[in-house]
Amino acid sequence: MTSDRSIQFFEKQFEEHVRTGACELNPFELVAIPYLKGRVLDYGCGMGNLAFAAAERGCDVLALDASPAAITHIQQRAAVAALPVHGVVADLRDYELNEDFDAVVCIGLLMFFDCPTAFRALSSLQARVREGGVAVVNVLVEGTTYLEMFDAKSHCLFSRSEMESRFAGWSVLHSEFSDFEAPADTKKVFATLIARKPGALHEAAV
């Protein structure tokens, strides 16, 4: 997340989730889970619900987020559950990754960056997917009218064709647009893309 406004918006949500014990996967995470295996990066992990679901399926997960409340929760939960989920507080605008992953997940994050930063971060994530590995990316796209959580000068609504264009040459395993109603007669329009990086032989996704 790129601005104080965005961080504060989600920090309050995460603190409420900790208080209530909310840990259900959202619809985008449910779509992603069957494609995850091996070493997984959850980039913008929030409360870590997807990270723990992946770990329970045998994955080893690096979970990064800008929210101290979320990462503290993840670290405590991982210790209690003895699961391989490693939570790290990180400024994801320019976080330098130093390893490759079998799967990279970035759900609901990149739209909180300005567009040049979002595109740069996406390229960095793509570069860290191993040959034959999978990327799962979910963003808000043009047509979204609910903007309450954004800094006015620091957000990015992707064009509807942006995702598939940036994954040209990859094998697209799943691609969809989803509309959700939002307050004050507004809406959120999401694009979700799951793609396999060309290269090494791989097992088919479950």
Each predicted region: which residue ranges?
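Short catalytic micro-motifs in class I SAM-dependent methyltransferases
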Residues: 108-109
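Conserved beta-strand/loop positions that form the S-adenosyl-L-methionine
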Residues: 43
